[in-house]
Amino acid sequence: MDGDTICLRHETDDDRTVFITQVTDGKFSFSGETSSVTLCHIWTKKNPQNTVSFFLEPARITVELSLTPERNRVSGTTINNTWQQLNDSIQLLGQEVVRTSLLPMADSTTQMLRVKTIDSLHRKMSDCILNTARHNSDNPIGQYIKKNYKAPEFK
């Protein structure tokens, strides 16, 4: 990733890049001051689909931007550690959904069991998100989820 350009934007900036920096010796950094907590997105110009979301706040935040999204990490503050835990949970459940959906076709009873398994995994994902919001209702994660997440209407 050396020499690649790292882009950062606040979620509220309508897809405008706010800051850019270069990767040198496998590392990059941004510095500045902020008085509020804002959800931000960071990506490389060479691979803009590989985006990491994190909460920018007055603290030192570590973002590990890997070549593959599942290895991306964010840490360094209570809010970002919680955000990473939520993302890890959703990612694990999502991988299980994909694994289950890619199993070879089987008889109708087995297929119905797989559909129920996938439905159960989707419910667990929703529960993870809603529980994170509930446990963090007094901070930006809970407020962000409450504002932006609509729980599915499971049947």
What does each model-found stretch correspond to?
Residues 1-132:
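A non-transmembrane, solvent-exposed segment enriched in polar/low-complexity residues
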Residues 138-152:
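Amphipathic alpha-helical repeat scaffolds of TPR domains
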